[in-house]
């Protein structure tokens, strides 16, 4: 089940995290945006702060190289959440189609060349979705969050082992999304 109060509370921060997981630009590390969106009570505050502190040691071109090496050339940290989740391309294709329809159902128009399981796109969807009064919201938002949960689990562990800067962003995301779910008793989410 979705904790809609927390989802509403953290929507803007999901957009901020999405920005951190896109190819880095100068505004990616804008301190004013960070301070405006992420306050000390945010569940991922310490992780995002650690990420910023590590990245501030590098130039923008070095950060872009770190990003490319991490996400474009490694199968252990794909930004496509279903990349390692399905046994066949057919199964993955069906999920991609389902996500695309889901986004359109809630008014998000995708760019033609983007896959619907791209993490930043999924977070932008959660940031902008208007669910109030829509009976389809709970099931569909839960699907998106669970795909992100599954897709980031291995990535969080791999990047965490390396003390990789982007590991902090993934941990902040997972902590935030965990609070957006109301987990039934007896069921546990991965940390």
Summary of predicted features, one role per range:
Residues 1-191:
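Charged, alpha-helix-forming regions
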């Amino acid at each position: 089940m979705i904790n809609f109060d927390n989802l509403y509370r953290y929507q803007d921060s999901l957009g901020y995290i999405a920005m951190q997981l896109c190819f880095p630009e100068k505004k990616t590390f804008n301190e004013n945006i960070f301070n405006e969106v992420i306050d000390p009570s945010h569940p991922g505050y310490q992780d995002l702060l650690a990420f910023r502190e590590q990245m501030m040691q590098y130039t923008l071109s070095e950060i872009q190289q770190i990003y490319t090496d991490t996400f474009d050339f490694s199968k252990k940290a794909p930004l496509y959440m279903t990349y390692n989740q399905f046994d066949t391309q057919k199964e993955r294709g069906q999920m991609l189609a389902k996500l695309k329809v889901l986004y359109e159902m809630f008014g998000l128009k995708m760019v033609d060349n983007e896959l619907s399981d791209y993490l930043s796109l999924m977070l932008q969807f959660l940031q902008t979705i208007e669910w109030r009064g829509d009976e389809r919201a709970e099931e569909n938002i839960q699907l998106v969050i669970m795909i992100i949960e599954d897709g980031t689990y291995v990535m969080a562990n791999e990047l965490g082992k390396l003390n990789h800067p982007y590991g902090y962003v993934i941990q902040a995301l997972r902590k935030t999304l965990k609070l957006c779910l109301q987990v039934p008793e007896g069921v546990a989410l991965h940390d």
